[in-house]
Amino acid sequence: MTEAISYFRARTLKIIVAGALLVFMGFSWESNHLNSPHADADNGGLFLPDGFQALVVVDSLKGQARHIAVNKNGDIYVKARNHYLNGGYGNIALRDTNGDGKTDIITPFGKYDGHTYGTAMRVHDGYLYFSSELMVYRMKLKRDQLVPDSRIDTIVIDNPPYHEHQTKPIAFDNKGHIYVGWGAGSNAGQVNNRQPGSPGIGDPGSPDKGNPWLKDHAGIWRFDANKTNQHQSDGIRYATGLRSLVALDWDPKSNSLYTVAHGRDDFRMIWPDLYTPWQSAMQPAEEFFKVNEGFDGGWPYYYYDGIKNKKLLNPEYGGDQVKEGDGAKLAQPLIGFPAHFAPNDLLFYKGKQFPAHYKNGAFIAFHGSTDRAPYPQAGYIIAFVPFKDGQPSGPWEVFADGFARVDPILSVSDAVYRPMGLAEGPDGSLYVSETEKGKIWRIMYKGDKKAFGTAQLAAMEKRKQTASNIKTPDEIKDNLFKDMPTTSVVYSTYCIACHQADGKGDGNRFPPIAQSEWVNYNKTRLINVILNGLKGPVRVKGLSYNEVMPGHGSFLSDAQIAEVLTYIKSNFNNLPEIVTPAEVSAVRKMTPKQNYDHD
């Protein structure tokens, strides 16, 4: 009997221990990522506030990266920027198997529409949501399964054609809704997109004669997050007057939707008689909005002047940097960030790892400018805005810098990394993705949270005031072209904003002209493109681009076109060749005038 009792006790103890071990193992697999790993000695090359450290989760991904999401067990999901380089797959799954914070498993998955603007990647209510340029999809996630094997459901459907600003960012409220951004296929609502001097369509004072892009674009639509195959007509237009939005998030603390919108481009290129290069580099502000139902941001009629802190009428609608029109009646930004910083993600911090200063505040990923020349390109940072009661409670801060790795940034292609996506890990770490290599960082706080204060922010505040990619440039001293060899006046006025000072484009929207087959192998075609413009999609050096190239024949003379094409063909490692005014004239006569003369 005693032996039986001893056996029973021993067996029971083994079962208890084994059960506890299994529970611990199950728990530890899900939570071992919650134990903050060691940071890289150089913080992955980043500058951070005192007490913060960083490590590189993955150095590069073949498909590059747009937005990212982190599951509750630490698995990372990446929206691939380039499906072709990713084996045709649109998503990438990452897992750390040993708790050192570094990726050990990289698995591409999910085949769907493969254009490069598609942005979203979010984990919500047990599903993985992601987007292409036209669609929003989701897949059911299963516990401990890295790559979902569930079917891809289509949640929201947009219709072709493809055009600029189609990114489909998403956000979720606490009532079962998904919010989807619908960018406008236009820069400033012009009759001829991005063409110098072309007027805007519509009357800002007459809703019945409004810009046609406002009917089904340039806004945010709300849908049922759990219903499939919804078209735009099945949703509710929640907000309008937003040209291009990539950064979108719902703040559970204030129970509100927020966005940081991209301002318009090309004041100098389109209106060279109204804007100096410095004014064009400084305007307009990138607007941080709280978005309530019925919101109107004012595009395309108005822009926000970040120096005067007021909305002004766009020149396409009779603006002259002074006229305000009805701008004061429109939604005003919480903050006007510096022009062309390119806000590409927004995240309200809900974790407990960071000091109290960051609780419920907003992190913003600024991808970086393309059109600030002749001044340094700017942005390329992670910013932070402290919040209280749904409103900013202090000035915006530089949270992370050092992504570009060069100073100053003359052309966008000089930047080694461009921050793109933000995600919060289960332990409160902040994850940052970037587009050029697909690199991902994990930022952690290792200091004394109670001691965190102004002193720990001092070095980053100094960067805000002095770094060339962040500070307000001096109009004379910071002009990077003042000491450079003479360039083409036509190129610096009309071409440099898109194709850049080095001719390499921006790697995403605007194609390179350096060593380009469009420049080197068919002179007649090249002249025709300058005269009449070109609409995408087009392939340049193996990559697809979908931005409009405006025709220049209506405002440039034969001599000016010959001069700029000779300059382009004689630079940027192209095949040198002279283009004459007579050759331009001959091509002009071959083309019906209405194709390029819109005046």
Give residue ranges: language-model regions.
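Beta-propeller domain segments
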Residues: 32-50, 63, 137, 184-233, ...
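Flexible coil segments in periplasmic/lumen-exposed cytochrome c-class electron-transfer proteins
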Residues: 33-35, 304, 377, 450-482, ...
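Hydrophobic core register within WD40 beta-propeller blades
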Residues: 68, 119-121, 170, 245-248, ...
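Residue-level detector of Asp-centered blade-edge/turn motifs that repeat once per structural unit
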Residues: 71-73, 123-125, 172-175, 249-254, ...
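Conserved beta-propeller blade signature
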Residues: 75-79, 127-130, 177-181, 256-260, ...
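Asp-box/WD-like beta-propeller blade repeats and closely related beta-sheet repeat scaffolds
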Residues: 105-112, 116-124, 133-173, 203, ...
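The canonical Cys-X-X-Cys-His
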Residues: 422, 440, 487, 491-501, ...
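Sequence/structural segment immediately N-terminal to covalent heme-attachment motifs in c-type
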Residues: 481-506, 521-532
